[in-house]
Amino acid sequence: MADRATLSMRSLVIAPGANPVTQTIAPGEIVGLAGLDGHGQERFLKVLAGLERPAGGDVTIGARAITSFRKAVASGIAYLPRDRRATGIFPTQSVLDNFAVSTLSRDMRFGLLSFAARRRRYESYRDKLSIVAPRPDASITTLSGGNQQKVLLARALALEPAILLLNDPTRGVDVATRHVLYDVFRGLAADGMALVILSSEIEEILLLCHRVLVFREQQVAAEITGDEMKSDTVIAAMFGRAA
């Protein structure tokens, strides 16, 4: 895993006219993002991933500024996209190729790709995430939606990040897979990884996260922690009213 570091946002503005956000996310912390669709939580997550530019302020991990996706990855940030079919999987490629695309440089031996090293890496994450696939060279499209999502998560984890950004990670997966993923997320946090989870399901956020940032009109409308972590409180903040 990359060195543990704090993800910091200083006077971060995700849309013109919105209030700035100043936050830190510490190693081992799971922070949830909630809000009505289109109210800024997804843009905020993509800014943290270096996929979109903010209207103002900055994002840093340690002393490194995150100004692009490439810099985010190099600094120990991994991002799991929301729509696995459109922006995650490569549908014409195998399970193994989909897994290994982000770590090709780590599987090189004397300037040549080591297929054995690549397969060993895949098998390690296959076992950790309980990926069910007929064989590594099977098409990724032969897998269930839940197992496709596990392959994408394995791809992100193979980068050995310090910070994992998850965009609706259980969207469209079965209940059994959800609980496998929940256990994985908790284990990663226990090992010191910081996680930021955007979810369209409030109960999921409350189940997994230490605190919740609720977005409304492109800014953080509320930060909810401790005994206030209840569905009614989150929903009230989403609609701009008191709980």
Q: Which stretches of residues belong to each language-model region?
A:
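Glycine-rich phosphate-binding loops of nucleotide-dependent enzymes
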Residues: 1-243
